[in-house]
Amino acid sequence: MNTFSLKIVTSDGLCYDGQAEELIVRTVSGDLGILAGHCNCVAPLGMGMATVKIDGEKRYGACIGGMVTVLDGNVKLVPTTFEWADQIDADRAYDSEGRAKRILGDKNSSETDLRLAEARLKRALIRQSVAGYKPR
């Protein structure tokens, strides 16, 4: 299968730099699949699972916010946060879910706290889901 150059970069550093056969990411408009020869584009990322096919093997990651760009066969994924499935601390994700649900259930929570808790809950659920896709 044909490959393309893929870089996954966050503010914490480089997560991946190499060839890939396929990338599927969640954008704010829905899922975007990228193969070699994809047209140039820029898209804002939503929150979801990223699937990267490398040497015939699929790897999964929790990809939150940011941008994806395709330019002349080079793909750059620049999410706000990115964690490969095997790097996710599932216990921490479950703790985050519990904290967010407590805030959402508190009648005294401010509108700002509720919005932040909703985002935290969504991130926690995505991280839990992706952690279940660890390559074996």
Q: Which role does the model predict for each range below?
A:
Residues 1-5, 133:
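N-terminal export/targeting signal detector
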Residues 7-99:
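Compact, glycine-rich, soluble single-domain proteins
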Residues 82-136:
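Acidic/glycine-rich phosphate/pyrophosphate-binding loops and surrounding catalytic core
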